Amino acid sequence: MGSHILYELLTKTKSRIYCVIREKDNINAIERFYEKFHFYFPNENLRNYSHRINLITGNILKDNFNLPDEQYDFLGNNINCVISSAALVKHYGKYEEFYNTNVAGTKKITNFCIKYNIPLHYISTISVSGYGLVKSPEITFTEKDFYIGQSYEDNVYVKSKFEAEKLILNACKNDNL
């Protein structure tokens, strides 16, 4: 998802983009970034956009995204929106793994946005609509809905994304996110 969002931002705006990328399986974050982008857009030359892309090795699971205070503050004081598609997206595994990335990681992103008064654009999943409504199966679930009685707790991925959305909605209501 992130590569597609980046592509749209690069080709349809003039924005400067800061990408916080984590290392994975001992693969350098910058190398991983280029591999992912070129997988989806093999004919696109990122060098054409290098003056607008700032790649930052970080980790949303760590305090300050595992960045030095100065770099964290620089980001907070120099960006005008956050688009978060960070997520553990497999559908099976241990709930703790999903919680750490999809809920606790989202909490750290949310706290960053609140601290620096930056709008957050959060990418979720239609899966939060659940597997059907418990009491009234004929109700339609839309992007304006959150909890309408749907069943979502049987899948660890869906449950974690539901909890992340709940966290963000509460931050919007209580913390002026």
Where are these regions (language model features)?
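Conserved beta-loop-beta element that borders a ligand/cofactor-binding pocket
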Residues: E165-L177
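N-terminal Rossmann/SDR dinucleotide-binding element
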Residues: M1-S85, Y95
